[in-house]
Amino acid sequence: MTNIQTWIDEYHKGSRFGLNGDVLIKQKSQYQEIIVIENEYYGRALMLDGCWMTSLKDEKYYHECLVHPALSSIDEKSNVLIIGGGDGGTVRECVKYAQISKIDLVEIDEEVIKISKKFLKEIGGEAWHDKRLEIHVDDGVKWVKKTRDNYYDVIFIDCSDPSEFSNLLFSDSFYKECKRILTPKGILATQSESPESFKNIHINILKTLKNIFKVSETMYSFVPIYPSGIWSWTFASSEDLNLSKQNYDEILKIEKGCEIWNLNFQNAAFKMMPNKIIKELDS
């Protein structure tokens, strides 16, 4: 079904967020239903199994916040792993760093990559052709299990909300395996859901990472297309995590290519934890 104008809604606990426009593609992959719609305000937007994943209008709120706090603060960043990220946005932000030698993108659903390359070209752009990128159509959990110890400097978990095929990406055992394959000073960076719409999942992620890693920090910002509009990203490490330790010359170069992220934005975002979340984490 293509080029049919209609409303497409995401439903969440008695509420809904919808976009009206032309449906460019609607198909069922092995894992999920994939829809791309063209909306007057948000531009092209991607929905997976009834949940909005990204749009051309606001995708940089998500991708820049996931990537740059980790990569701008770690000295050694040769090997990077992205789990999920089939729209190409996380890859695009990673390739801005010349020190990276290799990026492994592990996406379970090849159709997401194909459709993103065709209908959401503005997101991945030329990053799809970067020589450092290797794309693996594979299960992220299985990939991590078969990876040797201390291999990756940074791991990005850029996955959808918990579902039948992604639940294990939020599990205790998976985070422990990620810790195993990280270098001693490596950083795990993960989207950690909304403190409002997915509060229980959010709390569970934060508590789990706090128990597994020596230190973890969470930042909050806006992704308008997501339920409640507020989202979070959590960064964890087995060593001291100093996300304010920056190479300022490098930061200035990166900031120039960003629409949302800069160092002041980041520093403020790490101080935005709602008090109700603090209370639950301390209980």
Curated annotation (Swiss-Prot):
Binding sites annotated in the UniProt record for S-methyl-5'-thioadenosine: 32, 107, 139-140
E.C. designation(s): 2.5.1.16
Listed pathway(s): Amine and polyamine biosynthesis; spermidine biosynthesis; spermidine from putrescine: step 1/1
Catalytic-site annotation from UniProt: 158
Domain PABS: 5-238
Superkingdom classification of source: Bacteria
Leading EC class: transferase
Compartment(s) where it occurs, according to its Swiss-Prot or TrEMBL record: Cytoplasm
GO biological process entries: spermidine biosynthetic process
Binding-site list for spermidine: 63, 87, 158-161
Subunit structure: Homodimer or homotetramer.
Protein's recorded name: Polyamine aminopropyltransferase
Source organism per UniProt: Prochlorococcus marinus (strain MIT 9301)
